[in-house]
């Protein structure tokens, strides 16, 4: 059973010029840090995304910030850590993480996640797996009313070895994917997106996902797949910034 907690106590003292959604995202991030940051933490994972910017901001305000290191999940989060004046570490140096904070593209009612819209899914999952507690911060648009694949309609992000993209694409179609696309760089880059690990990304649309654990396992068995953006039963809590300006927390 999920516990739902509504709070508006972090809304006060914010710039009136900010949009209500941005205020709520900031409130969610601040509340997530304040309620979950472990006393005596030595290693903290910091993810990426627009809401995690506020997580880094709040962590930088802690009086004991010199006593712990922050491990990034990719280039963007590395820059967040540096810009916030926090001590930077790596997952190679610190394979055990006390707590990790990250965003999500979608969260279902069982706290399963779709991540990878920002192309950092492998390192995000590595840090999440290393963490004793994994806390998600997002806005209300990322919350599914039931299953994954309802709010996030771009498909499951899948990181693959570049030379395997054609074979993996065919295999995903055979598994029932309605649409399979090799993610492109768009106007910023000609050709496919290249991850921080020098891999490609495929987005595979399976519609509403009935069993994310099985789908993750089936995809991982395909030769050439590095990791999927399905984070199954990894999150400890999720904080949502609501359109109303309140914060809603889902926990196990």
Curated annotation (Swiss-Prot):
Pathway: Carbohydrate degradation; pentose phosphate pathway; D-ribose 5-phosphate from D-ribulose 5-phosphate (non-oxidative stage): step 1/1. It comes from the Eukaryota. GO terms for cellular component: cytoplasm. GO terms for biological process: D-ribose metabolic process; pentose-phosphate shunt, non-oxidative branch; pyridoxine biosynthetic process. GO terms for molecular function: ribose-5-phosphate isomerase activity. Its EC number is 5.3.1.6. It is found in: Cytoplasm. InterPro entries: NagB/RpiA_transferase-like, Ribose5P_isomerase_type_A. Pfam families: Rib_5-P_isom_A. This is Ribose-5-phosphate isomerase. It comes from Debaryomyces hansenii (strain ATCC 36239 / CBS 767 / BCRC 21394 / JCM 1990 / NBRC 0083 / IGC 2968). Keywords: Cytoplasm, Isomerase. The gene is RKI1. It catalyses: aldehydo-D-ribose 5-phosphate = D-ribulose 5-phosphate. Belongs to the ribose 5-phosphate isomerase family.
């Amino acid at each position: 059973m999920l516990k739902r907690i509504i709070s508006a106590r972090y809304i006060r003292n914010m710039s009136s010029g900010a949009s209500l959604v941005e205020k709520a995202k900031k409130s969610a991030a601040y509340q997530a840090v304040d309620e979950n940051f472990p006393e005596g933490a030595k290693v903290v994972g910091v993810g990426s995304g627009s809401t995690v910017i506020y997580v880094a901001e709040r962590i930088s305000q802690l009086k004991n910030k010199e006593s712990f290191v922050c491990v990034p999940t990719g280039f963007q989060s590395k820059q967040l850590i540096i810009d916030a004046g926090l001590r930077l570490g790596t997952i190679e140096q610190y394979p055990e993480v006390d707590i990790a904070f990250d965003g999500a593209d979608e969260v279902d009612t069982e706290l399963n996640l779709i991540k990878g819209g920002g192309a950092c899914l492998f390192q995000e999952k590595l840090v999440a797996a290393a963490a004793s507690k994994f806390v998600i911060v997002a806005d209300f648009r990322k919350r599914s009313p039931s299953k994954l694949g309802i709010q996030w309609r771009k498909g499951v992000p899948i990181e693959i070895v570049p030379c395997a993209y054609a074979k993996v694409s065919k295999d995903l179609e055979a598994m029932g994917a309605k649409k399979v696309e090799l993610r492109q760089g768009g106007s910023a880059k000609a050709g496919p997106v290249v991850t921080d690990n020098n891999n490609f990304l495929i987005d595979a649309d399976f519609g509403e996902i009935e069993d994310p654990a099985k789908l993750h396992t089936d995809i991982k068995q395909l030769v050439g797949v590095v990791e999927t953006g399905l984070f199954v039963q990894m999150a400890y809590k999720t904080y949502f910034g609501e359109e109303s300006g309140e914060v809603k927390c889902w926990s196990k």
